[in-house]
Amino acid sequence: MDDSFDIYEIKARQVLDSRGNPTVEAEVLTAGGGYGHTIVPSGASTGTFEAVELRDKKEKYGGKSVLNAVSNVNDIIAQELIGEDARNQRLIDQIMLNLDGTENKGNLGANAILAVSLAVAKAAADTASLPLYKYIGGSNAYVMPAPMMNVLNGGQHAGNALDFQEFMIMPVGADSFAEAVRMCSETYQSLKKVVAEKYGKDAVNVGDEGGFAPPVKTIDEALAVLLEGVKKAGYEDEIVFTIDSAASEFYDEKSGSYMIAGEKVSTDKLIDIYKEMVEQYPIVSIEDPLFEEDFEGFKTATKELKGIQIVGDDLFVTNTKRLKKGIEMGAANSLLLKVNQIGTLSESIDAANMAFRNGYSLVVSHRSGESEDSTIADLAVALNAGQIKTGAPARGERTAKYNQLMRIEEELQISKYAGKDFKIPF
């Protein structure tokens, strides 16, 4: 019997994320010397139905310390998992879910559970001398995702008057992932010049995800600036746009309307705004176009915006129960996968498989509070996701993922860049 995969040690600590807030890092060591470590991310605009991120709510770090989550790993989770075979991912995740005993992981904290879940997979991969993407995805993992790079910021990610949160570029016309990164980087530099010329040098300061947050006043103005940046880079034919509205952030529950540029707008009117946008600009995907509980509205938007990828983030929160409801209703046609929304690797894979089985596309995503951890890069390839959003080609916690993907592409030798097939990449 091979006991080299048995978990020998689990240790957690408090470290910092890219916004200077505390987060959980976990390390796992197997008897065979395999090592895995993970730093969990944290979101700024979070869905109401996400798994619970445990914070101490005491004086240190303004109430955001995670020492309780850390001690839950060191004192509770570790005791249960020592001696378990690290290859039994589903069993290990289930043990942690049983230990927690809640629907939303509110006892131990999704940040504690996820840190261990991912670190266990990495330790098992290391013990097997396999890269993580191959350990999770096997020999079928060969699709390099088309990157959605967030280059203009609004909403919760910026201090401007822009209602929509992210304006992204996606180089579907590239021939490889490395070329896609180059196109985005050149466009980013081009956009930087456009923004500086129009709004002054102060406007090229970057937001949480590396995008620029110039003082644009309207959505149309932001899209026009973005288009100018793409044209000046020479990639008008290769690059398309994707939007993350994060509409729950500007939804007024009392009136049942949305606040756009200071005006109250109905669901139907907002869908009309999206229709005008996709006619005028090369937009192929809209994330969270409506309030997170408006499944009916999402159903209407999916029907009305024919051919456009409608991505559920706050709508689904990487949760198979909510995704199942969306599939049955025809609400959205794409799942945004954020591992920390659900809290284990097994549940994340289940959500991805459910999406694919039902004809929904998949976008693997970072959070605004990230780190140098690049696990989601491997996960995107392991799942043949076809799409990844992990910020601008700037800031180390963002480029860590793009750099890892370029390494993977080089290592794979035979791979397929999703490109124009980003919705169904295999």
Curated annotation (Swiss-Prot):
HAMAP family: Enolase. The active site is at E209 (proton donor), K338 (proton acceptor). It catalyses: (2R)-2-phosphoglycerate = phosphoenolpyruvate + H2O. Its EC number is 4.2.1.11. NCBIfam families: eno. Its cofactor is Mg(2+). GO terms for cellular component: cell surface; extracellular region; phosphopyruvate hydratase complex. Keywords: Cytoplasm, Glycolysis, Lyase, Magnesium, Metal-binding, Secreted. SUPFAM superfamilies: Enolase C-terminal domain-like, Enolase N-terminal domain-like. One of its GO terms (molecular function) is phosphopyruvate hydratase activity. This is Enolase. Transmembrane segments: none annotated. It holds the Pfam family Enolase_C. It comes from Methanococcus maripaludis (strain DSM 14266 / JCM 13030 / NBRC 101832 / S2 / LL).
